[in-house]
Amino acid sequence: MRSHPLWCTFTLVIASACASSAPARRADASSAAEPARYLYVWAGDKDGKSSDFLAVVDVRRDSKDYGQVVTTVPVGMAGSLPHHMEYVLPERGQLLFANGHHHEATFLFDIEDARQPRLVRTISPPSPYRFPHDFARLANGHVLVGYLRSEGASPLPGDTTSPGGHGGIAELDEAGRLIRSASAADSSSKIPVRVYAFALRPGIDRMLTTSAPMMEDTSADVVQIWRMSDFKLLRTLPVPPARLPDGSVVPNGHGYPFEPRVMADGSVLLNAYGCGFYRVTGLESDRAEIRNVHTIDARSAGKRKGACGIPIVVGRYWIMAVGRLSALVTLDVGDPAHPVEVSRLLADSSFHPHWMARDPGSNRIIVGAENGGEDRMLMALVDSVTGRVSWDRSLRAADGAMGISFVRTMWPHGNTGEAFGHAALFRP
């Protein structure tokens, strides 16, 4: 999302009640999975003077280094605004993709040695596309990448975003080489489509993408349906207003369709950044529909959007990071046509949850922030039976504060000062 340079700011492992476009777990995460040993944090140097880096945090509860940063991998770029990584670790032997938004760079890391990952290469977007954002791993190991922009002017008169053309998608091989690409341009949308995130339905040769901005002034509030086999754009669906149970419309509730997930019945459920929830059905036909099925009331945020960010799905539960409410909200999506809120967990008002990832070997969830709180990450625990979430108070920084702190001067790579973290993944 739109972010200040210093306060930055798919495919998840989902239990049996919900399907997913996620790849299988890494080969070294066995069916009798144990809690992850490490956490990878994609971090930026706060003052932008030193290199951004991938940090390795020891998260073994019985380790003398529990909660400590044990390794860092500088990427040789400062001020890149480290943003998204893949949402699930790739299979063993494959490289982990991560993006640095400001420099339009995608970094590929070898993570075979869990404690000592290494940067293998850095790649630029394939012309004419600009600003890579999200990644979705295919079964063959290739990676789909969404691009927010393309070369040229915005199709919207008066939009000064430059370059400002419609975004697009590309398929890259395991090494980051271009296989194919396609534009998200649609004559039905005069507002630029900013490809944000993916939901994959390979069994019916379909995928869905959302549209949301980072630093762009304008972005179409639409979702798009594609044929996976040839990247043919089939439909562009406007996102309808977000309504509360009494029928009243939440202003901006439909804004910035954000993160989609495939449900067990084949439908796609997605949250808008404005905290409306939408179900897309009929992807396999020419009669696909999108309906507002739930809305989290974030009107206390005023005219700003509620900042519903990255979800995780645990069985029948959708756990939603809601930045403006400083909360994790759990929805029961066993019936995706009728989500029901079951619990809320509050953080302090300075921490605005945005990113989440689940440890496939335990009930731990790492929670990162956006637009407030990026100087730390918090650990949460989920009850898979009830969907209730609690804070893990065993993980504390050197000053005793809960979570992992990036407020420090020394790192394994040197005395470079404070950092911020955005994305994180558990490493078995």
Tell me the role of every PLM-derived stretch.
Residues 55-59, 160-176, 220-230, 379-384:
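Beta-propeller blade signature
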Residues 27-35, 84-92, 135-139, 150, ...:
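Structural signature of eukaryotic scaffold interfaces centered on beta-propeller domains
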Residues 191-328:
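Beta-propeller domains
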Residues 69-83, 122-128, 180-194, 235-253, ...:
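Surface-exposed loop and turn segments in beta-propeller and other repeat-based domains
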Residues 34, 41-48, 145-165, 209-222, ...:
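Short, conserved, GDST-rich strand-edge loop motifs in beta-rich repeat architectures
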Residues 111, 116-202:
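Asp-box/WD-like beta-propeller blade repeats and closely related beta-sheet repeat scaffolds
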Residues 67-137:
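Blade-loop segments of beta-propeller domains
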Residues 302-384:
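Loop/turn-rich, solvent-exposed surfaces of beta-rich toroidal or solenoidal domains
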